[in-house]
């Protein structure tokens, strides 16, 4: 739908295209098709563009995440599906800075960010115990609780980084 890019816009478009990883696309395709049972098609971005497969994916990971899947008859239905998916993955635990914008997928402007979001979703799924073959398991917060007496004792200890105070004196010091 967009015309040709010139100047800085063309440079940005080329830089984004260079960051796109076909190997990651294959891994994402295997994961999504395995989880949903639906074939994406030859063109990865076009297969996800209507948002239906994405909503099925999040509903498999967390049932009931998206209540209504719009039949993608018109463009606004497709955009609404993508928007519902993005809201659902945010509630699932994907960080807002990892989430693509609906137009990145719908207008084919930033496929790299779409890949990054799907990898972040796979990582979150792995963290929640799903058997996912890509992404990393996020670390869990380990809360430590110390007794007040132990905390007071720690204030009186001179740390090894501070060295020793055994030979401390003011000998050789002069006033300004």
From Swiss-Prot:
Q: Name one GO cellular component term.
A: focal adhesion
Q: Per the UniProt entry, what are the Gene Ontology biological process annotations, in alphabetical order?
A: actin filament organization; actomyosin structure organization
Start and end residues of each Calponin-homology (CH) domain: 22-125
Q: Which residues carry this modification: Phosphothreonine?
A: 164, 174
Q: What keywords tag this UniProt record?
A: Actin-binding, Calmodulin-binding, Phosphoprotein, Repeat
Any one GO molecular-function label of the UniProt entry: actin filament binding
Positions of post-translational Phosphoserine modification: 169
Q: Which protein family is it in?
A: Belongs to the calponin family.
Q: What is this protein called?
A: Calponin-1
């Amino acid at each position: 739908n967009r015309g040709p890019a010139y100047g800085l816009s063309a440079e940005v478009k080329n830089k984004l295209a260079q960051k796109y990883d076909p190997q990651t696309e294959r891994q994402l395709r295997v994961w999504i098709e395995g989880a949903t049972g639906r074939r994406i098609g030859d063109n990865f971005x076009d297969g996800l563009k209507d948002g239906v497969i994405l909503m099925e994916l999040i509903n498999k990971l967390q049932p009931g995440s998206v209540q209504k899947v719009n039949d993608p008859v018109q463009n606004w239905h497709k955009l609404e599906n993508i928007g519902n998916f993005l809201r659902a993955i945010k509630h699932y635990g994907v960080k807002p800075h990892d989430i693509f914008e609906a137009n990145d997928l719908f207008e084919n402007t930033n496929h790299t960010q779409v890949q990054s979001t799907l990898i972040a979703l796979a990582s979150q799924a792995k963290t929640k115990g799903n058997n996912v073959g890509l992404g990393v398991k996020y670390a869990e917060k380990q809360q430590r609780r110390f007794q007040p007496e132990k905390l007071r004792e720690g204030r009186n200890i001179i740390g090894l980084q501070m060295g020793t105070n055994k030979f401390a004196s003011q000998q050789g010091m002069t006033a300004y």
